[in-house]
Amino acid sequence: MIGIVLVLASLLSVGGQLCQKQATRPLTTGGRRRHLMLWLGLALICMGAAMVLWLLVLQTLPVGIAYPMLSLNFVWVTLAAWKIWHEQVPPRHWLGVALIISGIIILGSAA
């Protein structure tokens, strides 16, 4: 159960980061202020919810085990940037993502 909460905290944190990125995107039409407020508001909600879930995780797991699992954020952000904004991800970056996933598996199996 706590593993699900940890993954959800990670996803919400990443969601907040992605909302911040979306808030900075240029608009072709008017409504810049509304666009900015919407995405920043969503970012705050996501980050706040992530913090609450993170506190629940820390009540259960040692921080030395829980914190490295937040490395998943790098994986989620890379995938989202690649899929949503069609950002180029060089092979070296994908190798880094694979190494992060490997590290998470190793650390997770030691818990």
Curated annotation (Swiss-Prot):
Pfam family, one: EamA
NADP is among the record's keywords: no
Species classification: Bacteria, Pseudomonadati, Pseudomonadota, Gammaproteobacteria, Enterobacterales
HAMAP family the record matches: Flippase_ArnE
InterPro entries, A to Z: EamA_dom (IPR000620), Flippase_ArnE (IPR022883), Small_drug/metabolite_transptr (IPR000390)
Record's protein name: Probable 4-amino-4-deoxy-L-arabinose-phosphoundecaprenol flippase subunit ArnE
Known role: Translocates 4-amino-4-deoxy-L-arabinose-phosphoundecaprenol (alpha-L-Ara4N-phosphoundecaprenol) from the cytoplasmic to the periplasmic side of the inner membrane.
Pathway terms, separated by semicolons: Bacterial outer membrane biogenesis; lipopolysaccharide biosynthesis
GO MF term (any one): carbohydrate derivative transmembrane transporter activity
Major subcellular location class: membrane
Transmembrane segments: 38-58, 61-81, 91-111
Compartmental location: Cell inner membrane
Quaternary organization: Heterodimer of ArnE and ArnF.
One GO biological process term: lipid A biosynthetic process
Species: Salmonella heidelberg (strain SL476)
Superkingdom, taxonomy of origin: Bacteria
GO cellular component: plasma membrane
Family classification: Belongs to the ArnE family.
UniProt domain EamA: residue ranges: 40-109
UniProt keywords, alphabetically: Cell inner membrane, Cell membrane, Lipid A biosynthesis, Lipid biosynthesis, Lipid metabolism, Lipopolysaccharide biosynthesis, Membrane, Transmembrane, Transmembrane helix, Transport
SUPFAM superfamilies, A to Z: Multidrug resistance efflux transporter EmrE
Topology in the lipid bilayer: Multi-pass membrane protein
